Amino acid sequence: MDTNTTSYTPLPGDPFLSGPPETPRRPLKGFAVIFASVIFLMSLVALIIHQGPQQPPDVMPDKQDEHHHPQSTTNTMLSWQRTAFHFQPEKNWMNDPNGPMYYKGWYHFFYQYNPRGAVWGNIVWGHAVSRDLIHWLHLPLAMVADQWYDINGVWTGSATILPNDQIVMLYTGSTNESVQVQCLAYPADHKDPLLTKWVKYSGNPVLVPPPGIGVKDFRDPTTAWYITEGKWRITIGSKVNKTGISLVYDTKDFIKYEQLDGVLHAVPGTGMWECIDFYPVSKTSDKGLDTSQNGADVKHVMKASLDDDRNDYYALGSYNEKTGKWVPDNQKIDVGIGIRYDYGKFYASKTFYDQNKQRRVLWGWIGESDSENADVKKGWASLQGIPRTVLFDQKTGSNLLQWPVEEIEKLRLNKKNFDKVQVKAGSVVPLDVGTATQLDIVAEFQLDQKVVESAAETNEEFSCQTSGGAAKRGALGPFGLLVLADDSLSERTPVYFYVVKGSGGTVNTYFCADQTRSSVATDVVKQVSGSYVPVLKGETLSLRILVDHSIIESFAQGGRTTITTRVYPTQAIYGAARLFLFNNATDTSFTASLQIWQMNSAFIRPFSPDAASHSSFTPVTVFIKFIVPFGIFLTLYFVR
């Protein structure tokens, strides 16, 4: 968006908003000299500490520790489940990603958080910042439930960056009568790159449920996009009976709104739409687009999180700014009845445009698949998926491509290559990678094409969910990897392809993940997930898997189909976790080539509420107490 030609109305009651445009400058420039000096002086002490003896990150506690803790076996299992490089708070419950953005050199991430326990409730906004989307620094809570209009929860919302570095945050508040209303907040000081203090607009709420909409069916405003009439436009999720809808509003000042006639889009039978996302993707470029961009080379993505089945669906289509309507390219795969972002545990997702690297980045909430009692016992629940870049798939023209942000590769340690490993039908091949708890796996599979061509045709409909999992053998599948497996294979999580030759000789490929034997525990969800994955002529079957303790994120064919899996093994943990290739097909062998990296842990520094009260944290104190140590760590981390 061209800020030089954009007209806008400043927010009232905030003096900085009416000031003249500032010359762009590097973030935290004023702190540069102080930071360098402190790094030099304190790194000597930090180096000594750093060079001291350290316990390996993935070893079983010693026997003496077990002797002193009668419940150590259970506690050890629960402790192992906590991830090493996925974002999560130190304790308690977390759900939806909120208001992600890049601002003055920092990535900001807000999230739904319960400061009182490991179950949903008492929802406020947590806040963390990062330089690279991998290493994080927790900050004080951004917003708490302290007003009549949000006393029952500061629910999901989105950030919009306006000209002159203005930021507006629209969020849903649950009132003292549990009515869902839309509220406005903005930073107390837009010059603070950490955005440590937020102000709620005194005239909140700015939107209430319109006539015909239920008081509990009006939530989750999107990032606003600028339209040619000099207004900003947002959409909000709702429903009418069983039809999921997205309401549309225009505003000039984010205080007064005009509701457009009709809706942006609606799909009968899909139920309540929440956490709507609406954004452009380029049909010709591998760069992301600002949310306000439109044009001939642009498609628009409409995504809704379906409250009925707790999955995220998207569709590609065309957006008409004048009518305020969006139309899907293919009604057979419309929102809620077609393609999902992810076929596993992935919900309430939210993208943002990263102007720093000209990319669109996707966050998604990864809930638990164990029991609530287990969550309470371990003291935490849920995490966020590794942020993903999102692009239009120019080859298929019908899919998005999702891929882990490139920064995750900074955590790669020692690498092992396996070239052209032959895996015969009905066999399992161990891969000697050491402890297989934290891995980044890139693999390609080559089937025997003669066998594929001669395979019998079948009219049988295949579904990952109803196929019987990796134990069900077919002529051309399943085959892939056994992740988080123990030596005896009593616990394993297969991530695999299944190829079906249909009538007329068409070959369809499915990508699945099977939890049914992931754990001998009985209080966890065990199901098979996955879907069809487009494989074009001449393409090799490929996948990437990120393994991080209790989460497995899998990407097929460059990210056309993805599956996020939560697993809770009791034996395939710590040093007992292994990795295998497997081929459970009856008629074909395959050749696999793999690159596998051990992964380091991310640095996620907690915020301690005991260190100071929320009100005493200024940009300077936050910098001294948290940013300086954070910088020291990163310096040591990348030079070792």
From Swiss-Prot:
Residues engaged in binding substrate: W93, M94, N95, D96, Q112, W120, W155, T156, R219, D220, E274, D307
Reactions that this protein is recorded to catalyse: Hydrolysis of terminal non-reducing beta-D-fructofuranoside residues in beta-D-fructofuranosides
PROSITE patterns in UniProt: GLYCOSYL_HYDROL_F32 (PS00609)
Cytoplasmic side: 1-29, 640
Active site: D96
Protein name, UniProt field: Acid beta-fructofuranosidase 2, vacuolar
InterPro entries: ConA-like_dom_sf, Fructan_Metab_Enzymes, Glyco_hydro_32, Glyco_hydro_32_AS, Glyco_hydro_32_C, Glyco_hydro_32_N, Glyco_hydro_beta-prop_sf
Organism encoding this protein: Rosa hybrid cultivar
